[in-house]
Amino acid sequence: MMSEIKTNLLDLDRDAMRAFFVELGEKPFRADQIMKWIYHFGCDDFDQMNNVNKVLRERLKAIAEIRAPEVSREQRSSDGTIKWALQVGGQEVETVYIPEEDRATLCVSSQVGCALACKFCSTAQQGFNRNLKVSEIIGQVWRAAKIVGGKRPITNVVMMGMGEPLLNLANVIPAMRLMMDDFGYGISKRRVTISTSGVVPALDILGDQIDVALAISLHAPNDKLRSEIMPINDKYNIEDFLAGVRRYLAKSNANGGRVTVEYVLLDHINDDMQHAHELAKVLKDTPSKINLIPFNPFPGNPYGKPSNSRIDRFSKVLMEYGFTVIVRKTRGDDIDAACGQLVGEVIDRTKRTMKNRMQQDGISVKMV
């Protein structure tokens, strides 16, 4: 006889958790109690919850569990960055912890692999398998907080790990609610950031359901170049994307009225001075601060990192237009934890890895 599948309480945001306990015949406040144990104390053992009566504890042990992804590998960088490979149903996703003097940021994955095939991203070359569940997203935060320890182990969360978060809103939104909930991690909405490559319809849905900080992966100042390095641009071009961003900003209080624009600098591809002028002009109607990200190379990729002088010139052009510009300091590159380097272990349903390998070997995909 098969045992009944237990409910993983990490899959439930506060509303769902309260509904779960009401269905058990309990008062809604029980949900708040349990959430505090899970998220404030990092507890995954019902027996340790000493303000919950024994009858309820025994019942919970029979029908529920608190199960976060387990760490399969840990790497520590010389700069303090930590990268974990976490097991999610026979595959792996990567999560990165970035400590600084005044904050501690966790970079969280939303999918196993990624469906979008951006040319400069290591994750994209692995193809795509599936969306992560709520428990597998908030579970990354839970696991990291438990390992790091301390009173406020994580102050900021960025949904910038593996995957396109807006293609998994059904799970990403409840997970972000838990990050911000006072009975969860209590992180300010200004310190929870979602990043997107431009899934415009989902951006409109996001703005109707939750308010968090927004970052956009732009990476090119015109449609021709952007389509070459980011195929999603063929579906949602720059004009449509930025219009969607402005609609989101009109609904949001978490962004201070402007979006963070991420722009990876690829040597002699998108980093010429004309590109900087183009970028300033294309963003003139969209209040922005710009993060310039020098490319982080990975094996098998044709792109290079620009020289410091090219990066500096590009940055100065944008500042002359009045933009706030930050050149992102590369963190964790000695353990492949920098932007665009996350890989994990993906069973590729899109067969992208195989196609890329065949093309490199001069084999036609159509022949196969």
Swiss-Prot record:
<keyword id="KW-0489">Methyltransferase</keyword>
<dbReference type="InterPro" id="IPR007197">
    <property type="entry name" value="rSAM"/>
</dbReference>
<feature type="binding site">
    <location>
        <begin position="217"/>
        <end position="219"/>
    </location>
    <ligand>
        <name>S-adenosyl-L-methionine</name>
    </ligand>
</feature>
<feature type="binding site">
    <location>
        <position position="114"/>
    </location>
    <ligand>
        <name>[4Fe-4S] cluster</name>
    </ligand>
</feature>
<feature type="binding site">
    <location>
        <position position="296"/>
    </location>
    <ligand>
        <name>S-adenosyl-L-methionine</name>
    </ligand>
</feature>
<dbReference type="GO" id="GO:0030488">
    <property type="term" value="P:tRNA methylation"/>
</dbReference>
<feature type="binding site">
    <location>
        <begin position="163"/>
        <end position="164"/>
    </location>
    <ligand>
        <name>S-adenosyl-L-methionine</name>
    </ligand>
</feature>
<keyword id="KW-0819">tRNA processing</keyword>
<feature type="binding site">
    <location>
        <position position="118"/>
    </location>
    <ligand>
        <name>[4Fe-4S] cluster</name>
    </ligand>
</feature>
<keyword id="KW-0004">4Fe-4S</keyword>
<dbReference type="InterPro" id="IPR027492">
    <property type="entry name" value="RNA_MTrfase_RlmN"/>
</dbReference>
<dbReference type="InterPro" id="IPR040072">
    <property type="entry name" value="Methyltransferase_A"/>
</dbReference>
<keyword id="KW-0479">Metal-binding</keyword>
<dbReference type="GO" id="GO:0051539">
    <property type="term" value="F:4 iron, 4 sulfur cluster binding"/>
</dbReference>
<feature type="binding site">
    <location>
        <position position="195"/>
    </location>
    <ligand>
        <name>S-adenosyl-L-methionine</name>
    </ligand>
</feature>
<feature type="domain" description="Radical SAM core">
    <location>
        <begin position="100"/>
        <end position="334"/>
    </location>
</feature>
<dbReference type="InterPro" id="IPR004383">
    <property type="entry name" value="rRNA_lsu_MTrfase_RlmN/Cfr"/>
</dbReference>
<feature type="disulfide bond" description="(transient)">
    <location>
        <begin position="107"/>
        <end position="339"/>
    </location>
</feature>
<dbReference type="GO" id="GO:0002935">
    <property type="term" value="F:tRNA (adenine(37)-C2)-methyltransferase activity"/>
</dbReference>
<dbReference type="GO" id="GO:0070475">
    <property type="term" value="P:rRNA base methylation"/>
</dbReference>
<dbReference type="GO" id="GO:0005737">
    <property type="term" value="C:cytoplasm"/>
</dbReference>
<dbReference type="InterPro" id="IPR048641">
    <property type="entry name" value="RlmN_N"/>
</dbReference>
<keyword id="KW-1015">Disulfide bond</keyword>
<protein>
    <recommendedName>
        <fullName>Dual-specificity RNA methyltransferase RlmN</fullName>
        <ecNumber>2.1.1.192</ecNumber>
    </recommendedName>
</protein>
<keyword id="KW-0698">rRNA processing</keyword>
<keyword id="KW-0808">Transferase</keyword>
<keyword id="KW-0411">Iron-sulfur</keyword>
<dbReference type="GO" id="GO:0070040">
    <property type="term" value="F:rRNA (adenine(2503)-C2-)-methyltransferase activity"/>
</dbReference>
<comment type="function">
    <text>Specifically methylates position 2 of adenine 2503 in 23S rRNA and position 2 of adenine 37 in tRNAs. m2A2503 modification seems to play a crucial role in the proofreading step occurring at the peptidyl transferase center and thus would serve to optimize ribosomal fidelity.</text>
</comment>
<feature type="active site" description="Proton acceptor">
    <location>
        <position position="94"/>
    </location>
</feature>
<feature type="active site" description="S-methylcysteine intermediate">
    <location>
        <position position="339"/>
    </location>
</feature>
<keyword id="KW-0949">S-adenosyl-L-methionine</keyword>
<comment type="similarity">
    <text>Belongs to the radical SAM superfamily. RlmN family.</text>
</comment>
<dbReference type="InterPro" id="IPR013785">
    <property type="entry name" value="Aldolase_TIM"/>
</dbReference>
<keyword id="KW-0408">Iron</keyword>
<keyword id="KW-0963">Cytoplasm</keyword>
<dbReference type="GO" id="GO:0019843">
    <property type="term" value="F:rRNA binding"/>
</dbReference>
<dbReference type="GO" id="GO:0046872">
    <property type="term" value="F:metal ion binding"/>
</dbReference>
<feature type="binding site">
    <location>
        <position position="121"/>
    </location>
    <ligand>
        <name>[4Fe-4S] cluster</name>
    </ligand>
</feature>
<dbReference type="Pfam" id="PF21016">
    <property type="entry name" value="RlmN_N"/>
</dbReference>
<dbReference type="GO" id="GO:0000049">
    <property type="term" value="F:tRNA binding"/>
</dbReference>
<dbReference type="Pfam" id="PF04055">
    <property type="entry name" value="Radical_SAM"/>
</dbReference>
